[in-house]
């Protein structure tokens, strides 16, 4: 189901779970889980349906061979009667019985005594019956059956084969468990299996699990393969301190190959009945999805609650493309009350945007309208863009020749009526640039020159200024250079190479007075290793930072020459300032860091080793105060699809007392072929408090599995903890009962992709 992507404009201090190594590919995952399932279930019960060309069965000339103790032939009728340990074979069809009566003209086989019949994709036993071998039809009395789809098997008082794709059963028991193990069993008065549609339909059915009858249903449909189809999806059952009992019963409607919808009725004990829905569509020229939720008269909030999302995109003639992304909520607490993850529940804004764009050769143009819904009343509203028009040119790259670039933008910035104290207006920004990249195997040199002209037309001047049409023009000059040194060596019989890559980056931007310019969409960039090589310390056009500085950095790599894998990359760098930085976001801002002659030391490393091990880190050290300012370190191990262990640590100090120091542990650990442990612990060292604790256990057999999980989370400072329990049952070939645990794990544990069952 679609998830709205809220945005925290002020910068979320929460972060994703511990990193994991790149891990197995999709093909490796598929092969691994298939092999694990074979280990649990043993060999297939029947020959796969695609093992032979079944069209040959329908040809009268396809020969049959018979081995029997006695053969009787009625020449006038063209019928055979075989008796005594009869074995009849025709292509992949194999029949055993004490007596077989065969009409050669029609291909019909009558079976008055117990028999065993096998063909690709099907195995039957019965007390009596008849089979039409050329047409894949027949009837069986008191029979047992096995199909290759998901190891389906069962027994029925009467069994009718309509053709190779459709079959009907009366007084039938159905399961996907191995013979001798009937952990779950569906007993129905009537069952229809449609292999062409991949659908099973049972009427007047009892479902029994571990010899305990659980429920009766007059009618139920279920998938017998992996295709999508209309019907009930997995009901969800959960309980939490906040909501009490929480039950969802989603219904999927496969309207057409390019349309589908999901209706999600949900009952929340302490709030009431909520109705959610999603509609997806796909056409040649456009596609998209609509999503909404509505809760009338929330019992706790005493008001109607709702959420709306529209994501639409398409193509127009002459290469034009458009998209619209609209997100709205009834109130600022909606995501906190009904969201499922830390990102959703801590988000501060919802974005709505419409855009039209095109590209011709080296030109790209776009028109955009952007609005925001602020979910936190304590935060200022972001500026709306009504509209934003851009035209950008980027010339082709040709070795040894200059490359030209031009970015132009016009934007009208507006605010809701409640923000009358902040300036509104228009901004025109023009930024031409030329650079010349000289590259050799041993190094490179890239000089560049840029100009940025920004002009405003304001409804009211910036406080403290009197100019409604301020403007600013500022040039920037930079030179980026680097050298490459390498040293081949041998490590434990493996050919390797180590590189040493010094890099020097110089940038000069003269100071221009900018206090009379508004701050519409500009902020100071986060400073990590990549920031050492930026020409501007600000994002957005409202400020261009003055600069006269040199960055010196060093990178080393260890590369496996055999497979090309980069086992280790480590970098260290620092900026040396030739003068103080004068340009700030606001005149009253005074940052001690802007008066220093050197920046913090910045370091980063990444190591990806054989066996699915990944280590990754970024670090920022303040040499003036001799302390760490910021860092993130992650260690992951993902050697196979069902094993994932990750640990992470993040810290950030010195931001007006809002220190962040968090640790994150996450793991999915198999305990043999049947059990798996699942856990995550996100802990705030700064607050000495757990932000989220998740623990669970999964048990699987050949034909069913269960996952039980508990979660305890804090969703804000001073908030009461919320405890919830999630339970998931999945029955192979029938469906699942889920509380959303799979989606939750994919959101919470980085690298968790779900389990093929």
From Swiss-Prot:
Entry keyword Lipoprotein: no
A Gene Ontology BP annotation from the UniProt entry: Gram-negative-bacterium-type cell outer membrane assembly
Keywords: Cell outer membrane, Membrane, Signal
Origin superkingdom: Bacteria
Signal peptide: 1-21
Subcellular location: Cell outer membrane
GO annotations of cellular component type: cell outer membrane; transporter complex
InterPro entries cross-referenced by the UniProt entry: LipoPS_assembly_LptD, LptD, LptD_C
PANTHER family attached to this UniProt entry: LPS-ASSEMBLY PROTEIN, LPS-ASSEMBLY PROTEIN LPTD
Assigned protein family: Belongs to the LptD family.
Protein role: Together with LptE, is involved in the assembly of lipopolysaccharide (LPS) at the surface of the outer membrane.
Subunit and partners: Component of the lipopolysaccharide transport and assembly complex. Interacts with LptE and LptA.
Name recorded for this polypeptide: LPS-assembly protein LptD
């Amino acid at each position: 189901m679609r998830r709205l992507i809220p945005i925290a404009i002020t910068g979320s201090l929460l972060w994703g779970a511990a990193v994991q190594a790149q891990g197995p590919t999709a093909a490796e995952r598929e092969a691994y889980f298939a092999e694990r399932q074979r280990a649990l279930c043993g060999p297939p019960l029947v020959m796969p349906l695609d093992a032979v060309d079944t069209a040959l069965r329908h040809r009268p000339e396809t020969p049959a061979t018979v081995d029997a103790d006695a053969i009787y032939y009625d020449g006038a009728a063209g019928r055979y009667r075989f008796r005594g340990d009869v074995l009849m074979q025709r292509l992949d069809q194999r029949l055993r019985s004490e007596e077989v009566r065969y009409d050669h003209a029609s291909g019909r086989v009558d079976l008055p005594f117990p028999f065993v019949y096998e063909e690709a994709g099907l195995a039957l036993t019965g007390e009596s019956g008849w089979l039409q071998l050329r047409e894949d039809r027949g009837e069986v009395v008191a029979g047992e059956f096995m199909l290759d789809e998901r190891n389906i098997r069962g027994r029925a008082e009467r069994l009718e084969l309509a053709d190779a794709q459709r079959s009907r059963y009366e007084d039938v028991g159905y399961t996907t468990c191995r013979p001798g193990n009937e952990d779950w069993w569906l007993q129905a008065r009537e069952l229809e299996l449609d292999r062409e549609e991949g659908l099973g339909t049972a009427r007047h059915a009892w479902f029994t699990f571990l010899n305990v009858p659980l429920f009766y249903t007059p009618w139920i449909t279920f998938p017998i393969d992996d295709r999508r189809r209309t019907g009930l999806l997995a009901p969800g059952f959960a309980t939490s301190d906040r909501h009490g009992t929480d039950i969802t019963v989603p219904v999927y409607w496969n309207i057409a190959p390019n349309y589908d919808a999901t209706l999600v009725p949900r009952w929340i004990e302490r709030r009431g009945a909520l109705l959610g829905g999603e509609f997806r569509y796909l056409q040649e020229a456009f596609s998209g999805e609509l999503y909404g939720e509505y809760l009338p008269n929330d019992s706790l909030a005493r008001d109607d609650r709702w959420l709306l999302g529209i994501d639409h995109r398409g193509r127009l003639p002459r290469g034009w493309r458009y998209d619209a992304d609209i997100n709205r909520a009834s109130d600022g607490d909606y995501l906190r009350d009904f969201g499922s993850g830390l990102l959703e529940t801590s988000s501060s804004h919802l974005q709505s945007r419409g855009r039209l764009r095109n590209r011709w050769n080296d030109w790209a143009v776009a028109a955009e309208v952007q609005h925001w819904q602020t979910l936190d009343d304590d935060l200022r509203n972001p500026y709306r863009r009504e509209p934003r028009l851009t035209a950008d040119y980027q010339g082709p790259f040709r070795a040894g020749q200059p490359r030209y670039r031009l970015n132009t933008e016009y934007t009208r910035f507006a605010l809701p009526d409640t923000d009358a104290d902040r300036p509104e207006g228009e901004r025109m920004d023009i930024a031409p640039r030329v650079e010349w990249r000289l590259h050799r195997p041993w190094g490179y040199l890239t000089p560049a020159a840029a100009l940025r002209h920004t002009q405003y037309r304001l409804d009211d001047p910036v406080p403290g200024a009197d100019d409604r049409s301020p403007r600013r023009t500022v040039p920037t000059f930079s030179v980026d250079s680097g050298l490459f040194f390498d040293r081949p060596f041998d490590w434990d019989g493996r050919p390797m190479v180590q590189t040493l890559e010094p890099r020097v980056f110089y940038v000069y931007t003269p100071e221009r007075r900018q206090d009379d310019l508004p701050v519409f969409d500009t902020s100071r960039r986060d400073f990590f290793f990549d920031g050492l090589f930026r020409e501007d310390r600000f994002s957005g056009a409202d400020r261009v930072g003055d600069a006269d500085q040199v960055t010196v950095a060093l990178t080393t790599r260890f590369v496996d020459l055999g497979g090309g894998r980069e086992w280790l990359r480590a970098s260290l760098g620092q900026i040396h300032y030739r003068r103080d930085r004068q340009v700030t976001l606001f005149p009253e801002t005074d940052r001690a860091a802007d008066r220093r002659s050197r920046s913090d030391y910045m370091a980063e490393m990444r190591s990806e080793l054989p066996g699915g091990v990944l280590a990754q880190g970024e670090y920022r050290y303040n040499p003036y105060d001799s302390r760490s300012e910021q860092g993130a370190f992650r260690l992951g191990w993902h050697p196979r699809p069902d094993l994932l262990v990750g640990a992470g640590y993040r810290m950030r100090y010195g931001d007006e007392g809002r220190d962040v120091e968090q640790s994150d542990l996450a793991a999915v650990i198999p305990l043999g072929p049947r059990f798996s442990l699942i856990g995550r612990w996100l802990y705030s060292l700064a607050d000495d408090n757990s932000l989220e604790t998740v623990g669970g256990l999964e048990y699987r057999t050949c034909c069913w599995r269960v996952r039980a999980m508990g979660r305890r989370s804090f969703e804000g400072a001073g908030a009461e903890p919320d405890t919830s329990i999630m339970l998931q049952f999945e029955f192979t070939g029938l469906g699942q009962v889920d509380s959303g645990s799979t989606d939750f794990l994919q959101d919470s544990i980085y690298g968790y992709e779900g389990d093929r069952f």
